[in-house]
Every structure is written in C-alpha cells, then in structure tokens.
C-alpha cells in the first residue's frame, strides 16, 4: 500500500498538470499510480524519499520525474506531461535505469571469455527451434564485437540460465502480466547471477507483430554480460522496447559496443588458432576459388560457433565476426586427417566434430584428433554394404544425427548411441524438395542447409519445406 506522505507529494507534483475534477479524476489517479510505480521500480523513489524530505528544498517526486525525463531523452519539465506518460506506458526491461552506457555497480564481469548457456524451458508462442535461433542470434550480437564465445548446455548448470515464466517465477521479482515489463536479467556471477527471465504472458514472435524475442533477448543478455541501461535511445541497451522494422540489418549502436568493450575488450582481429602453425596454402590450378560460381563442397560442419567448409585438401573457416573467411590446408590443423572428406558434423553437447572418409571416421575437439580414432562406420551400426557417408547433420534440439547415403537416410540417437529402428527411409519422403544427391549439410538458426553441387537449399525441419535456394558460396558474400 502506498504511504500517505508519498501520495501527497505525488499530488503536489501532478495537480498543476492534471485537474482533479469530474470525469478526469479516475484517469488522473491511474496515471499518478502508474508514475509512482514507475519511479519506485526504476528510479529508486522509496529509497530516496526520507533523504529528500529532510532537505526540504525540493519535492522527491519532482526531482525523480526530472531524473527520469533526462535519462529517457525527454523534455525535462518535472511534470507528468503527455510525452512522459506515453513513454512510461511502453513495454520495457524490468532492470532499473542509470545513465549513458553503464555496467552494474562494482562493474561485475565474467572472468572467462567462454561462457555456457542453457534454455531451461520454452514459450508456447514459438516453435522450439525458433526460440533456439533467437537466443543463438542474440548471443552472436555480443560475440561479434568481443572476445566472448558461447556454447549451449542441455542439462545441469550453465553460466547463463534462460527461462520463461509468469508472475511469481522463483526469484522474488514477479512479472506483471501482458505489457509493461517484458523480461529481466542479472549481472555476471554465480547462482542466479547471469540468468535471464522472460515474461511468458507476452506474445513472443519472430517478427515485429508481437514482442520480438531476438531483440529482447539481445538486450537482456547484455545485462547478463554486465551492462546496465543506456540513456541513448538508439542503443540496444535503452530500457524501453524498440521494435526495429528491419531485423535483418540490425546492428549494435556504438554506445553498446563501447559499453561491452569497456568490460571485455574488442574482438580479436582473427580467431585464435591456439598456437597451431599455419601452413601456407600453395598457389596452383588445383586450389579451389572461393567465389567460383561452380564451387561445391565435400563436407560442412560447425565448430564452436564457426563454420568449416571442406574442399579437397583445404577448408574455409568462417567466423561470424569476420566477413572474409580464412583458407587453410586441412593438414595445418589436423595432420592425421585425410583430404577430400565425405561428411562432417558437430555434436555441440560433446564439443566434438566427427569427420568421415570412406568406411572410417575421426573425432576432433578443437585442434586435436581424439585417441582411439579412426573407427569403422560399421561400429555405428551401418550394414556392411554401406561404404561411405555422403553427408551428416546433428539436430541439437532433438539430439538426433541424420546420415545421408545416396537417396536414403539413417537416424542415430545420440543419447542411446545407436541407429534407430525403421531406417533407412527415402530422403524424398521426409525432406521434400531436397535433391537426393547431397554433398554436405549443416544446421544454423533453426534451418538445415543442404548442398548439392553449386546450389544450396534452406530447409525448415518443422514445416518440412524448402524456404530458399541459394548459391553454395553465398556464405562467403560472393
């Protein structure tokens, strides 16, 4: 319940701006309550009331209104004018406000540059893969401008635990239903610190028809990394939700970049190669050309947030931080791996990439081939008639790996470590529109990308349809 002194102070601040007679009385009372709640939640009104009353040289409410207006980039009037009322009615982050790009008090930050995250539960508003893609994209926003990297955990504790909840949801800071507070997050540290919570009473969307999950997640994860709110209306870390119309062209403002780099420094000029000597790529007619319109790939896999495109003795290493991919000999990273590999895929939960050539396969972690490899593909359960794998992909959400051989495919259960019964099945049955001659495949942003010759097909595994057809080397900005 609001205290009488506070209500009287609110009346002093507001009566001159809004007459309290007739039909406007109820609306004015509602606006006053909204303002008081806003100042208490985001500008520490109750904490400072006694201090201001003792001084008796200004109204704490008027001063707080001025502080709020200045921070939000409004005209500083000290009154609840129409522009101020419009802003405080908008949906926003639940974390309190401070000025310019800011970090939490004491400047908490992670003491390591590789962080883990876990999506604890899901909103029913979106398919799971759409939630996964939004969170992954939100993390990439910060990864691109810092040395930070992220990997996902599917069980146990992660540095950043991401969850959806309504009202009272376990942290003593309840949500308020649809609108107003969209989400909140905690500064870096152990336990609940670093975690991000999203109000599931909101209508979460992939576009701007409701509340865009990617935009809110990118903002909240900024808090999880140590940033507080910015007074710059162009910044992602501005507290009031701003629905960008062109999500495909979204970029951090310089204010956001300055803030996060004040904590972690800039992104490295190129990915860290962990001391592996780089063998120069020899020139010659046999060297594949990145923007060759007829370029095809032998295999493609992700590796710790990067994408590896294999071709003959070489591979391109594509980081989302850098437009230009690196080009290396396979032997410069993994001397014992063969050239012209057949298939490759990453199991993120095991931090392992598997490479296939003929009837053998290898397991690599980072720059090291694991002991006990190569092994026969028949140890995975394939019949002896299978002599090579054309392409493979591991679905991180379903924890299934798909192996494509000619016009059929097998499915492997990563939990049970065995091929599933009922396979093989024809590719055309479950992947309509996909050329059965598959050279390579990998997953990104909730889609499967199938490569056949010089073209690729973006496939939605939930809708079971091809959504785009592109050139194979479009990932190289060709």
Swiss-Prot record:
Domain of life: Eukaryota
Propeptide: 18-100
CC cofactor: Ca(2+); Zn(2+)
SS bonds (residue pairs): 291-478
Entry EC no(s): 3.4.24.17
Positions of Ca(2+) 2 binding: 159, 191, 193, 195
Keyword annotations from UniProtKB, A to Z: Calcium, Collagen degradation, Disulfide bond, Extracellular matrix, Hydrolase, Immunity, Innate immunity, Metal-binding, Metalloprotease, Protease, Repeat, Secreted, Signal, Zinc, Zymogen
Main location: secreted
Signal peptide stretch: 1-17
Motif (Cysteine switch): 91-98
Pfam families to which the protein is assigned, alphabetical: Hemopexin (PF00045), Peptidase_M10 (PF00413), PG_binding_1 (PF01471)
Active site: 220
SMART domains in alphabetical order: HX (SM00120), ZnMc (SM00235)
Cofactor note: Binds 4 Ca(2+) ions per subunit. Binds 2 Zn(2+) ions per subunit.
Binding, Zn(2+) 1: 169, 171, 184, 197
Alphabetical list of CDD domains matching this protein: HX, ZnMc_MMP
InterPro entries tied to this protein: Hemopexin-like_dom (IPR000585), Hemopexin-like_dom_sf (IPR036375), Hemopexin-like_repeat (IPR018487), Hemopexin_CS (IPR018486), M10A_MMP (IPR033739), MetalloPept_cat_dom_sf (IPR024079), Pept_M10_metallopeptidase (IPR001818), Pept_M10A (IPR021190)
GO annotation, cellular component aspect: cytosol; extracellular matrix; extracellular region; mitochondrion
Protein name according to UniProt: Stromelysin-1
Gene coding for it: MMP3
């Amino acid at each position: 319940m609001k205290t009488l002194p506070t209500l009287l102070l609110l009346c002093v601040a507001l009566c001159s701006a809004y007459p309290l007679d007739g039909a406007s009385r109820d609306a004015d009372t509602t606006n006053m309550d909204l303002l008081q709640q806003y100042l208490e939640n985001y500008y520490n009104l109750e904490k400072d009331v006694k201090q201001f009353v003792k001084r008796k040289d200004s109204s704490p409410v008027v001063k707080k209104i001025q502080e709020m207006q200045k921070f939000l980039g409004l005209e500083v009037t000290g009154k609840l004018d129409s522009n101020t009322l419009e802003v405080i009615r908008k949906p926003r982050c639940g974390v309190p406000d401070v000025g310019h790009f800011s970090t939490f008090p004491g400047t908490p930050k992670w003491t390591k540059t590789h962080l883990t995250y876990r999506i604890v539960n899901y909103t029913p508003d979106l398919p799971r893969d759409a939630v996964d893609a939004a969170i992954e994209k939100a993390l990439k926003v910060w990864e691109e401008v810092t040395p930070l990297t992220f990997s996902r955990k599917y069980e146990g504790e992660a540095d950043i635990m991401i969850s959806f909840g309504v009202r009272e949801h376990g942290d003593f800071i309840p949500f308020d239903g649809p609108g107003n507070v969209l989400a909140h997050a905690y500064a870096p540290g152990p336990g609940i610190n670093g975690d991000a919570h999203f109000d599931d009473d909101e209508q979460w969307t992939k576009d701007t028809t409701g509340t865009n999950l990617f935009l809110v997640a990118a903002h909240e994860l900024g808090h999880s990394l140590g940033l507080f709110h910015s007074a710059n209306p162009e910044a992602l870390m501005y507290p009031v939700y701003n629905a960008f119309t062109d999500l495909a062209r979204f970029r951090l403002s310089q204010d956001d970049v300055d803030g996060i780099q004040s904590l972690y420094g800039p992104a490295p000029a190129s990915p860290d190669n962990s001391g592996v000597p780089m063998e120069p790529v020899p020139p010659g007619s046999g060297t594949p050309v990145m923007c060759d319109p007829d370029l095809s790939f032998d295999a493609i896999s992700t590796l710790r947030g990067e994408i590896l495109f294999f071709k003959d003795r070489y591979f391109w290493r594509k980081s989302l931080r850098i437009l230009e991919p690196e080009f290396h000999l396979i032997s410069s990273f993994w001397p014992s791996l063969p050239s012209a590999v057949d298939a490759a895929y990453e199991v993120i939960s095991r931090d392992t990439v598997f490479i296939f050539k003929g009837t053998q396969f290898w397991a690599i972690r980072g720059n090291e081939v694991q002991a006990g490899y190569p092994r026969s593909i028949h140890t995975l359960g394939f019949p002896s008639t299978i002599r090579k794998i054309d392409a493979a992909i591991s679905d991180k959400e379903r924890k299934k790996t798909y192996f494509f051989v000619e016009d059929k495919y097998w499915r492997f259960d990563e939990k049970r470590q065995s091929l599933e019964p009922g396979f093989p099945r024809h590719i055309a049955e479950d992947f309509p529109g996909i050329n059965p001659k598959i050279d390579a495949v990998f997953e990104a942003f909730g889609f499967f990308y199938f490569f056949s010759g010089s073209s690729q097909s973006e496939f939605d595994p939930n809708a079971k349809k091809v959504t785009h057809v592109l050139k194979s080397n479009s990932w190289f900005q060709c």
